[in-house]
Amino acid sequence: MTPGKTSLVSLLLLLSLEAIVKAGITIPRNPGCPNSEDKNFPRTVMVNLNIHNRNTNTNPKRSSDYYNRSTSPWNLHRNEDPERYPSVIWEAKCRHLGCINADGNVDYHMNSVPIQQEILVLRREPPHCPNSFRLEKILVSVGCTCVTPIVHHVA
């Protein structure tokens, strides 16, 4: 994810959190939660909106079925955590250890490896507190790619 997209995602997470709080969605409360009615409870959050690459050129005609057409195809798996926002993140898992050759067969002379990206999420802290979150980075597999294997030669 580019720095501009990361900032945008962070802003969207904060706006979503505000919408959840304003909507009054009931979430089971942990007795150790900070009291949002307390005068010392923070009412504002500073956010750096330094967005890079505002003009992202996306071609809507390009097919997005890369996960099937890749020489290193992958499946998407649901990663769910109710203490995180967003609570559901779809992660890529490589289908094969090797890569698909031109004949459509798995070639074990190459390796299929996940492509990982750090993203920002909101984590409830302490757990089960509806109005208390901390920003957290997590590593997510977003696709797979084909690489040459690392070979160690013994002398």
Swiss-Prot record:
Taxonomy, superkingdom? Eukaryota
Q: Which UniProt keywords apply?
A: Adaptive immunity, Cytokine, Disulfide bond, Glycoprotein, Immunity, Inflammatory response, Innate immunity, Secreted, Signal
Q: What induces it?
A: Induced upon differentiation of CD4-positive T cells. Up-regulated by IL23A-IL12B. Up-regulated in peripheral blood mononuclear cells upon West Nile virus infection.
Record keyword Cell division present:
no
Indicate where this protein resides in the cell: Secreted
The observed outcome of changing residue 90 to V is: Has no effect on the affinity for IL17RA
Q: Tell me the tissue specificity.
A: Expressed in memory Th17 cells (at protein level).
**Residues the record marks as carrying a glycan:** 68
MF (Gene Ontology): cytokine activity; protein heterodimerization activity; protein homodimerization activity
Q: How does it assemble?
A: Homodimer. Forms complexes with IL17RA and IL17RC receptors with 2:1 binding stoichiometry: two receptor chains for one interleukin molecule. IL17A homodimer preferentially drives the formation of IL17RA-IL17RC heterodimeric receptor complex. IL17A homodimer adopts an asymmetrical ternary structure with one IL17RA molecule, allowing for high affinity interactions of one IL17A monomer with one IL17RA molecule (via D1 and D2 domains), while disfavoring binding of a second IL17RA molecule on the other IL17A monomer. Heterodimer with IL17F.
Protein name from the UniProt record: Interleukin-17A
> By which gene is this protein encoded?
IL17A
